[in-house]
Amino acid sequence: MAGSQAQWRPPRSCDIYCSELKHCKSLRNRFHEYYTYGRAPDCQQWKQDYQNCKDWEKNHSTQAKDSLQESERKRLADQRKFTPVWELRQKPPSDWHLPLNQGEPQDP
């Protein structure tokens, strides 16, 4: 079991966690998040992941490994959850084959 632990690698290198943390804390990203979502970004998870990655590289801590795995699973699950912008159609509109009235104004 100890041999399999030594071969495990974090899903991302520690440099990537560090660059994600720097990006999250950047002024440009903070402005974008505030403009888009109305709140400042929460960079705590990137910081914790970076610290866990460094801890794994130094000590091969099982707690750091489990924390990184759980964080990545949560991150992937959050990416899969989204609200579709458009309502998906089950069938095409009934008048899809008719020509468009480009010269005439449409009724409101």
Swiss-Prot record:
Q: Which InterPro entries match?
A: Pants/Emi1-like
Example GO biological process: negative regulation of long-term synaptic potentiation
What does UniProt say on post-translational modification here?
Answer: Rapidly degraded by proteolysis following neuronal stimulation, resulting in increased AMPA receptor clustering.
Give the keywords, sorted.
Answer: Secreted, Synapse
Where is the protein situated, by its record's location annotation?
Answer: Synapse; Synaptic cleft
Task: Report biased composition (Basic and acidic residues) as residue ranges.
Answer: 67-81
Query: Where's it mainly located?
Result: other
Role noted for this protein = Negatively regulates long-term potentiation and modulates adult synaptic plasticity.
Family statement drawn from the similarity comment of this UniProt entry: Belongs to the UPF0545 family.
Know the name of this protein? Answer: Synaptic plasticity regulator PANTS
Organism name: Danio rerio (Zebrafish)
Q: What is the lineage of its organism?
A: Eukaryota, Metazoa, Chordata, Craniata, Vertebrata
